[in-house]
Design a protein with these regions (language model features):
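Consensus "Asn ladder" position of solenoid repeat domains
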Residues: 2-3, 30, 35, 63, ...
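Intrinsically disordered, low-complexity Ser/Thr- and acidic-rich flexible linkers and loops
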Residues: 6-22, 48-59, 147-164
Length: 233
């Protein structure tokens, strides 16, 4: 806890890449469970490493983060990029981003509690992600997914990998008192099913190419009580 720099309360909160837990350079097959990792620039900073950035191969993969507290970070409760991991039953509260998962793939976000984050889950260029059974409460935006056309020219990674934003399942989550549940930009083949929405200002905001977008709420499967339902295209 309390490993933070670049922070002045109410004035400046960049974090400057300080972190409670740093994992990088092909750090794989670890279990991180039952820890308090709060009030740090990032709670967790997980990065695949320079070799992955140059070659598009490898990653900091197949780690399990279970029942930890990643709260009160001025930047990201969890930052996990260019890798494949599982985040299960964690507490993620009052961060700028609860999870920042840029370029993550084949990852699972299961049974976590997100509360009062600016963006609870933010993933750019993500692929094959499962967001299942989480609770989002009081977040400004619960889930934001997107693709940027322009990527840094000095990165080898996008030269060797498909970096489209695609293939998400958002299943059985509860959204309570969030301003926006799903913001989806240039992301293909997202299926949202069996989620519940209570006192949510806007359910979805879609833009760009969202081919294959499906949202299913079967009668009796979930209670939907939006304050102002809106779909923007």
């Amino acid at each position: 806890d309390w490993n933070v720099r670049g922070y002045s309360h109410r004035f400046y909160n960049r974090g400057q890449d300080s972190a409670g837990l740093l994992m990088y350079e092909q750090s794989c097959f670890n279990v991180v469970a039952h820890n308090s990792i709060t009030h740090s620039g990032d709670g967790l900073f997980l990065w695949a490493g320079q070799s992955t950035m140059d070659s598009g191969k490898g990653g900091a993969n197949d780690n399990l983060f279970y029942a930890n507290d990643f709260s009160h970070a001025p930047t990201n409760g969890i930052e996990a990029t260019f890798s494949r991991n599982a985040f299960v039953a964690n507490r993620v509260e009052e961060n700028w981003h609860g999870i920042w998962g840029g370029y993550s793939y084949q990852s699972v976000i299961l049974g976590n509690t997100f509360r009062n984050n600016v963006e609870a889950i933010a993933i750019e260029h993500g692929q094959d992600i499962r967001i299942v059974g989480n609770r989002f409460e009081g977040d400004t935006a619960a889930i934001r997914l997107w693709w940027n056309k322009l990527e840094p020219s000095d990165w080898g990674y996008p030269k060797y990998r498909d970096t489209r934003s695609r293939d998400y399942v958002v299943l059985g989550n509860s959204f309570v008192g969030t301003r926006l549940a799903l913001r989806v930009d240039n992301t293909q083949r997202l299926r949202a099913e069996g989620n519940s929405f209570t006192r949510v200002d806007s359910l979805t905001r879609l833009s760009g190419d969202t081919t294959g977008w499906v949202m299913v709420q079967r009668p009796g499967e979930a209670t939907t009580v939006p304050a102002r339902p809106r779909v923007s295209m």
